[in-house]
Amino acid sequence: RRDRWELALLNAALERDMPVLAICRGMQLLNVAFGGRLIQDLPGHRTESPNGRWESTRHQLYISPGSKLAAILGAGGFVSVNSLHHQGVGEPQKAAALMASAYSVEDGLIEALESPSHGWVVGVQWHNEIEKEVPKNFGNLFQSLIERAETYAQRKEAIPQQSELAPL
């Protein structure tokens, strides 16, 4: 039920060309919404602490210099980020309509996706909201999303009527 509801919300946003920042499971959902698949179980991308909670690990990734993500962050290249997921997207699973813009150096998994056919649709596998675990310039992702959302909100069709998004 959660997947259906989240896919419906994501598809409604995509149809309206709303800006979308999809984080972790959101990036995976973005790939599925565009017709891609997931690797179902990835060992080593998170650890379990003694209290039973999942904790993030760290790994290196490479951000493609010509990508939208690199433009938002101000640079491409190698960076270290957190990892806290057990599913993921590799090249064979990636939706054809999406562009991979960052890869894990260790295992080649896709760490960021973007939609070239939308104004601002970016998905990242890491948890950008955990500021202490990402480079400082990664805050640009949120700032760029806010700016795009403000621009979008000024358009007449920006806010859908509640009846358009009926529960599943």
Predicted regions and their residues:
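Class I SAM-dependent methyltransferase SAM-binding "motif I" and its flanking Rossmann-like core
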Residues: 40
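Catalytic nucleophile loop
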Residues: 5, 12-37
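Amide-donor transfer/coupling interface in amidating biosynthetic enzymes
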Residues: 2-16, 43-168
